[in-house]
Amino acid sequence: LVIAARHFGCELAVEELPSSDPDHLATIRLVGAVTSDAVDHELFAAMPHRRTTRTKYEDRLLPEELRHACCNVATERGTELALVLDEGKRAEIADLVAEGDRIQFADPRFRRELAAWVHSRRSATQDGMSGESFGMPDVLSSVGALVIRTFDMGKGIAAGDREKIVNGSPILAVFATRDDGPKDWLTTGRVLARVLLRLTASGATAAFLNQPIEVESLRPRLKELLSTVFTPQLLMRFGYGSSAHQTVRRPLDDVFM
């Protein structure tokens, strides 16, 4: 919202976590005019094209200038974006992701929740993920949801993710914060939004690999592997890959009160 406003020459003031209501994340006010710059326009233009690409990426790095620009977004917010290019370290992180897959898929509650979000793009729900996210045609999304809910596919998912990281992810990216509370989570989201748009504007893409952070026992191991005093909040892959279909989302009128 702040990025879009700047594109239109509007300055917004954001008050984060303004009340004791945990669902009241921010109060946003229009405070005046601002002179937009080229970056504002580039990020705004990238919004309709932003996708999560879960396939393997090309074996080439993002340009150094783009990597620095993404890291600077995090630094400006007092957070850290660690880019992992080392092959050995990426393999170690791949092992953590695979272990997280096995742990999560062994839990029927996790499988039920994941399956509940798998819908065809033609579904009336207009949210969630298509079965294409799991390598199947969109028309088989309902079948895919049934399979996910019923069977523990952790070993297969783990093997596929590990292969994709080792041989199809030239850069792993870890967003991290000094502390680990609601304000840190909100800041991470704001940094993430800007970084993803920066990648999209440059023709790159990204995907989430957050298993080592979602599984409580693995998060300290990821932190130790990164040799950081910051707390990991998000693990992602950055690179160049094939374009993905747009994910269906609810109309604007459905999400405004």
Each language-model region and where it sits:
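Acidic, surface-exposed loops and disordered segments
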Residues: 2-257
